[in-house]
Amino acid sequence: MVSSNFYKNLGPRKLTAIIDFLHDIIAPPKIEDIAIHDIKILQEASPNDISFLSNPKYSEFLKTTKAAACIVPKNFTGEANPNTVLLHAQNSYFAYGKLIDFFYAPIKSYPTKIMKSAIVADSATIGKNCYIGHNVVIEDDVIIGDNSIIEAGSFIGRGVNIGRNARIEQHVSINYAIIGDDVVILAGAKIGQDGFGFSTEKGVHHKIFHIGIVKIGNNVEIGANTTIDRGSLQDTIIKDLCRIDNLVQIGHGVKIGKGSIIVAQTGIAGSSTIGKYCALGGQVGIAGHLNIGDGAQVAAQGGVAQNIEAGKIVGGSPAIPIMDWHRQSIIMKQLLKTSNSKLKK
């Protein structure tokens, strides 16, 4: 149930208006143009609601759902409640995301102003139509682009450059960074701090001063409590269209290619390079100074200790080709059964 405390329902919406809005929908030739009041999961939908199916695990619920309509994959041919209108989409999950925007808007709004409790240096440049929240600190020579939002308690260090349409949530810290347009940084993220660099001499760990920065491209999202260290000599670089989940650690000098996705609790050690459109599952570990090729994927909890060729899929720790990992898992189960049966004898 969507809470009206936080989101405003913009419905009802006519079914034909929904189809027109989503553009790439294939609908039955004749449908009743009913009013749709809300979006619900298949199990909870009523005759006034629309639902969606993107994961085939939930296709059984389509037989019993009460939804008036349901967005399904383009090639879906399974059974469904005959009273539910099936709307076939090229990408049903993408269509669902657009539908959320069509039906809901956040109640929380941001006035175009700098709150009185914010501290903004005289030499800072704040663009047009920006919101600077309570207790934000913006230091000297910072540049913030038009239409940006900096929420309460965030710190923007000297010389940082943030592009247009940024949304920086509460208690974010940004230092030594240049950030592009349309970037979202969720609460508690820390960007541009010293990396983990020490030189050991005669039993003493001496800190290496980091003189690189962090460069973040356009249309990037960085999750809550994620940390991105600045480079020691070479910059840490996050290219356009990347999506980085919560609680990710990105070490100094790491380079992440365009469109890559990094899931929660992943750690990437210093000076490793992640190619374009890579996918790293949850709790993946990447050792330092490695190269992960374009389009490579690492399954959850994979431990990567050597380079991965472009397009390869690996899993396990140490990470190996995914099919080998599956075979190993099967063999281990068989060995365990054999050893258990011998122990019983």
From Swiss-Prot:
Gene Ontology MF terms: N-acyltransferase activity
Active site residues per record: 252 (proton acceptor)
Pathway given in the UniProt record: Bacterial outer membrane biogenesis; LPS lipid A biosynthesis
Record InterPro entries: Hexapep, Hexapep_transf_CS, LpxD, Trimer_LpxA-like_sf, UDP_GlcNAc_AcTrfase_non-rep
GO cellular component: membrane
Gene3D superfamilies (UniProt xref): Hexapeptide repeat proteins, MurE/MurF, N-terminal domain
EC number(s) from the headed UniProt entry: 2.3.1.191
Biological-process GO terms, alphabetical: lipid A biosynthetic process
Described function: Catalyzes the N-acylation of UDP-3-O-acylglucosamine using 3-hydroxyacyl-ACP as the acyl donor. Is involved in the biosynthesis of lipid A, a phosphorylated glycolipid that anchors the lipopolysaccharide to the outer membrane of the cell.
Subunit organization: Homotrimer.
Family: Belongs to the transferase hexapeptide repeat family. LpxD subfamily.
PANTHER family reported in the protein's UniProt record: UDP-3-O-ACYLGLUCOSAMINE N-ACYLTRANSFERASE, UDP-3-O-ACYLGLUCOSAMINE N-ACYLTRANSFERASE 1, MITOCHONDRIAL-RELATED
Name under which the protein is recorded: UDP-3-O-acylglucosamine N-acyltransferase
Species in which this protein is naturally found: Rickettsia rickettsii (strain Sheila Smith)
Gene: lpxD
